[in-house]
Regions:
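Alpha-helical elements of Rossmann-like donor-binding domains used by nucleotide-donor carbohydrate transfer enzymes
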Residues: 7, 23, 81, 113, ...
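Conserved alpha/beta-hydrolase "acid-adjacent" motif
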Residues: 72-81
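Helix-rich cap/lid subdomain of alpha/beta-hydrolase
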Residues: 1-31, 35-40
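Mid/C-terminal beta-alpha module of Rossmann-like enzyme folds, strongest
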Residues: 81-82, 88
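The feature captures the conserved acid-bearing segment of alpha/beta-hydrolase catalytic domains
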Residues: 49-60
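Catalytic active-site module of serine/aspartate enzymes centered on a nucleophile-bearing elbow/loop
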Residues: 89-134
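Short beta-strand/loop motif that positions the catalytic acidic residue
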Residues: 59, 65-67, 71
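Short gly/ser/thr-rich secondary-structure transition/capping motifs
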Residues: 41-49
Length: 134
């Protein structure tokens, strides 16, 4: 299963211009097996037990739930619902919604802003990011 450039733009890159959306489609879109999408709950059916996380695991690493305000694939309500599932844990957890951004927010031309926010969030919680050395 694969996405056409038009469908990619509508679902993933709806806040971008056609040129940037087409470049992202060319670079990142690859066919995916339908079973994978079904396991993730993206095929309209029930989620597979393989796609369920242990929200009560206090020993897990930090979790920053990032979303775009204009995301058509995972709406803000879905991200907030996931955050609420993790709300009772003592593990570091936080939500962040970026205004005027779509699902492509971590791969489009504004990705550095999102990355800087995530690094700052980690720093606020006393967590040092391990950045690659040049």
């Amino acid at each position: 299963m694969t996405l056409s450039p038009e469908r990619f733009h509508h679902v993933f890159a709806n806040t971008l211009g056609a040129g940037e959306s087409d470049r992202l489609h060319h670079r990142y879109v690859v066919p995916a097996p339908c079973r994978l999408l079904a396991d993730l709950g993206c095929a309209g059916g029930p989620r597979s037990p393989r796609a369920v996380a242990d929200a009560g695991n206090a020993a897990r690493g930090p979790l920053l739930l990032i979303s775009g305000q204009e995301d058509r694939l995972v709406p803000g309500e879905a991200t907030r619902a996931v955050y609420e599932q993790y709300g009772d844990t003592t593990a570091v957890t936080g939500p962040k919604q970026f205004a005027d951004r779509a699902h492509s927010l971590v791969i489009d031309s504004g990705w550095r802003f999102v990355a800087d926010y995530a690094l700052g969030w980690l720093d606020e919680h006393g967590i040092r990011a391990h950045l690659p050395q040049d």
